[in-house]
Regions:
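Conserved catalytic core of nucleic-acid polymerases
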Residues: 32, 115-225, 252-278
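Acidic, glycine-rich two-metal-ion catalytic cores of nucleic acid-processing enzymes
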Residues: 1-119, 176-215, 220-230, 243-250
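Short, charged/polar, Gly/Pro-enriched secondary-structure boundary elements
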Residues: 238-241
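Short beta-strand-to-loop capping motifs
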Residues: 231-236
């Protein structure tokens, strides 16, 4: 990511609300246990999209490969401990739906759209992201969700092109100033993509600022936050299932944002246990 300009840096450093920085620091301080030692991540929220990068000591924690075994080194610090990951289901469509006041039915978002498209789950997922991050085709603009998405994208673009070089857009939750001069080579969908990532980040910070104080009483630690997933080092013997249940309830925000749950002795070999929480 390209760093944002000094204007944004100054704004964040002088603004009374230091929630973003302080929340990320709370995650960083817990560290991640490897087979050799405890290592620490370092978040940088000053990126072109506002979505934090996370690298330290030559390791990119925001892009750990799921397939090459590099995650296997991460284990629990506790005797008989486990790593547990909560991963939001269809997070971006749900965030946009919430922003545009579109209520998804209970269950899978991609199954919901599969019925609309007349295709299977995997193809539905691919089409949804194609429409959201590409262009909503004319034939889909009569659908309540995609019609709202198209209008939202074009309204945002219309506002953006009217800005002069010193003007800015404000983020939805924390009113962060995103200066036009830092958003280069924009088009309507690229701008929308940037703003979705910022919306994701601020929504996560908002929920983490609620979650972290409530789980301080436990031995278990939250050790990594990556976009739509949250990794915890679970002290199973001390905290029992109470810890995981409380985390899940808070993250899901009264069921509005369902999560999938995986567990493993290391971060590479993780088993889906979502159904055990139903």
């Amino acid at each position: 990511f390209k760093a944002l300009s000094k204007e944004l840096l100054d704004y964040l450093e002088t603004d009374d609300d230091q929630t973003i920085l302080s929340t990320l620091k709370e995650v960083e301080k817990n560290g991640l246990q490897t087979t050799e030692k405890l290592v620490y991540s370092e978040y940088n929220p000053f990126t072109s999209t506002g979505r934090p990068s996370n690298r330290f000591g030559g390791m990119n924690f925001a892009a750990l490969n799921k397939n090459d075994g590099s995650r296997k080194q991460f284990i629990s610090r506790f005797d008989n401990g486990w790593l547990v990951e909560f991963d939001y289901d269809a997070y971006h469509p749900r965030l946009i739906g919430d922003r545009l006041e579109y209520d998804f039915p209970k269950g899978s978002v991609h199954e919901h759209f599969a019925q609309l498209y007349g295709v299977d789950y995997d193809e539905s997922k691919a089409l949804t992201f194609k429409y959201m991050y590409g262009t909503v085709p004319p034939e889909m603009r009569d659908h309540p969700f995609f019609g709202k998405v198209h209008k939202y994208v074009m309204a945002m673009w219309d506002k953006f092109i009217r800005l002069n070089s010193t003007d800015f857009l404000l983020s939805d939750i924390y009113n962060r100033k995103i200066y036009r001069k830092n958003l280069l080579d924009m088009n309507p969908n690229k701008l929308f993509n940037y703003m979705i990532q910022l919306m994701e980040t601020e929504s996560n910070i908002e929920i983490l600022s609620e979650l972290l104080p409530k789980i301080e009483k436990y031995s278990s630690k939250m050790i990594l936050y990556n976009y739509d997933s949250f990794l915890f080092d679970w002290d199973a013997e001390v905290d029992k299932l109470d810890y995981l249940k409380e985390v899940k309830v808070i993250l899901e925000r009264s069921g509005k944002y369902p999560t999938k749950v995986k567990i493993g002795r290391n971060y590479h070999e993780m088993e889906d246990i979502t159904e055990k929480f139903v």
